[in-house]
């Protein structure tokens, strides 16, 4: 099954059975996946929209990863997603869970370790990812978390939450946004205030020319000059087409 991308980005939430994926998605989006204490309650992919400040990011609760392999349609979904949230239960041998998850991903040529992608001589799909230790409020979670963090923090961001108790969820939203490497840019017309409710979403490192093309496919070619507020030397001065934009910049395009 294919789920059309909505919002600023699409993030697939993955994990082993009963890791806490559905509880997490239910807690930070408008989705209502089935949440239960027993495994394999998620049979289909369920999308939901997560609000972060003035944008929305689509999260997809996916069926649990279970041996021997990832189903073809789920593999396709993970490849299409902009990033992955990897959820592991901190009370159930989180390091073993991570080993199982990465092994299943690598069988389908999906890697989350940049070093493996660089070393491989075959075509791999490298994905941005964030590791989430779930169920922080239970039993041995706080004791198991340091080992998870120490083993993976050089590769990927790692954090601990309790979706049920609401612990760490606001921080998680910000981590998701930062992981995506996107920026928000706002447009304005001369002598008018910018609309801060409808940003252009661009990849980090994008230029004024990229922003013009995002507004309309013809604008990049027709662009004569632009004024910028934010990352320019002085607010409102003209900037070159190759000026690299930063999160929160306001631009005024002149065609």
PLM regions and their residue ranges:
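C-terminal-of-GTPase-core extension/linker across diverse P-loop GTPases
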Residues: 1-9, 14, 19, 113-255
């Amino acid at each position: 099954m294919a789920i059309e991308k909505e919002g600023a980005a699409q993030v697939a939430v993955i994990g082993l059975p009963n890791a806490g994926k559905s509880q997490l998605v239910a807690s930070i989006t408008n989705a209502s996946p089935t949440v239960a204490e027993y495994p394999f309650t998620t049979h289909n992919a369920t999308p939901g929209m997560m609000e972060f400040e003035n944008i929305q990011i689509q999260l997809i609760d996916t069926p649990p990863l279970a041996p021997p392999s990832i189903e073809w349609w789920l593999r396709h979904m993970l490849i299409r997603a902009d990033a992955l949230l990897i959820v592991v239960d901190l009370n159930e041998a989180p390091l073993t869970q991570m080993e199982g998850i990465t092994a299943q991903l690598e069988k389908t040529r999906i890697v989350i370790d940049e070093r493996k992608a660089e070393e491989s001589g075959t075509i791999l799909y490298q994905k941005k990812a964030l590791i989430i230790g779930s169920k922080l409020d239970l039993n041995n979670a706080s004791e198991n978390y340091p080992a998870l963090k120490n083993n993976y923090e050089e590769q990927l961001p790692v954090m601990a939450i309790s979706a049920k108790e609401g612990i760490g969820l606001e921080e998680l939203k910000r981590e998701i946004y930062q992981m995506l490497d996107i920026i928000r840019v706002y447009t304005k017309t001369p002598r008018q205030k910018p609309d801060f409710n409808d940003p252009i979403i661009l990849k980090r490192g994008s230029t004024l020319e990229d922003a013009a093309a995002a507004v309309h496919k013809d604008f990049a070619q027709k662009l004569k000059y632009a004024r910028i507020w934010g990352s320019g030397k002085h607010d409102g001065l003209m900037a070159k087409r190759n000026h690299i934009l930063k999160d929160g910049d306001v631009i005024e395009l002149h065609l």
